[in-house]
Structures are given as structure tokens and as C-alpha cells.
């Protein structure tokens, strides 16, 4: 049974007013938030993969304050089987390195065959967490995935960037639990 993990992030609504805490971080409890739009693309792709792989399990994973549960609820409303929220006050204001460490540990505990993420979060837009996760999980990363299909243990991804379209295929290898890819791009 393939296990698909989709990372989702609760981000502040960019159209609303924001306030900041004394440490310079956004006060996420005082602003309206939402599921990052780019993570919705990953969720939609995961649902398509789940439909094509009988018996697969789709789990959403997030890290953040209490409000991050709203992102999980939104993702689950699209479909999927379960959601996991890593929440600890000690993680407040974590940078990309700490975030990738915590998420990699959570993914390791969950187990996975495929991890999907948005290409970046809509709040910071750095896009570095997926690459850090791939390194920590010792799996390849494929960026700008436009279409993803799974058949017989092989994952085929159409990469579509501004300059080139190409197909990348891979399967499970010794020492590798899966493939990390991220979906969507800024337009």
C-alpha cells in the first residue's frame, strides 16, 4: 500500500493586515490564515495519484501554531485519509533548517513512498524546505512537477519550466524510501 505524504502550511492571508510580535515574527494568531495556495496544488496532485493507486494512503502533515489545524482541515476537505499536526511552542519562529529537521523526523515516523510539497510557501516564498527535506530523507527531489503518474512502482513526472519540458521517471531503489517532488509554480 503506497503512502503519500503531503506537506501543507498555514499562511497568513496576504490581503489582510498583519501585526508582528516583539521577536519580529508575524503574529499568526491575530491575522486570518489559510492553506498555502501552492500546497493546494500538491494536495490535488496527491489525490489524483491516490485515485490511480488502489489501497494507497494520503496523509497531510503540517508544523505550526494552533491555527495550522485550519490548513489541515482545508486539505482534508479536498480528500485524503489523515492529518498530522506537529505543534510545540519551542518551534515558534523556526527557520527553514529547523523546519526541515522537524518535518523530516515526522515523515520518518509516518513512513512514506512519496512526499509532495508546494514549490514554496506563499508567506516567505523561499522554497528551500523541499530541498532540505530531500537531503535529510536521502531521496531525490524533482522540481516543477506538472503531471505525475504512478504505475507498477514507477513514478513518472512531467517537469514543465519556462524553458523546457521533460519527463523524469524513477522507482524505489535500495536505500531510498521514495521520491520527493514539489508541485506548482508562481505565476
Put a short name on every predicted segment:
Residues 1-187:
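N-terminal glycine-rich FAD/FM-binding segment characteristic of electron-transfer flavoproteins
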Amino acid at each position: 500500500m503506497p503512502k503519500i505524504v503531503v506537506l501543507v502550511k498555514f499562511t497568513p492571508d496576504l490581503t489582510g493586515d498583519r501585526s508582528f510580535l516583539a521577536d519580529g515574527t508575524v503574529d499568526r494568531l491575530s491575522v486570518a490564515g489559510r492553506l498555502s495556495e501552492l500546497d493546494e496544488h500538491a494536495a490535488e496532485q496527491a489525490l489524483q495519484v491516490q485515485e490511480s493507486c488502489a489501497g494507497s494512503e494520503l496523509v497531510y502533515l503540517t508544523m505550526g501554531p494552533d491555527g495550522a489545524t485550519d490548513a489541515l482541515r482545508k486539505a482534508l476537505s479536498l480528500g485524503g485519509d489523515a492529518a498530522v499536526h506537529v505543534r510545540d511552542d519551542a518551534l515558534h519562529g523556526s527557520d527553514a533548517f529547523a523546519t526541515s529537521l522537524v518535518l523530516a523526523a515526522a515523515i520518518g515516523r509516518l513512513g512514506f513512498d512519496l512526499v509532495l510539497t508546494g514549490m514554496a510557501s506563499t508567506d516567505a516564498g523561499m522554497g528551500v524546505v523541499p530541498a532540505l527535506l530531500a537531503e535529510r530523507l536521502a531521496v531525490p527531489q524533482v522540481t516543477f512537477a506538472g503531471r505525475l503518474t504512478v504505475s507498477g512502482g514507477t513514478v513518472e513526472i512531467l517537469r514543465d519550466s519556462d524553458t523546457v519540458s521533460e519527463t523524469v521517471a524513477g522507482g524505489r531503489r535500495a536505500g531510498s524510501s521514495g521520491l520527493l517532488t514539489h508541485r506548482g509554480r508562481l505565476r
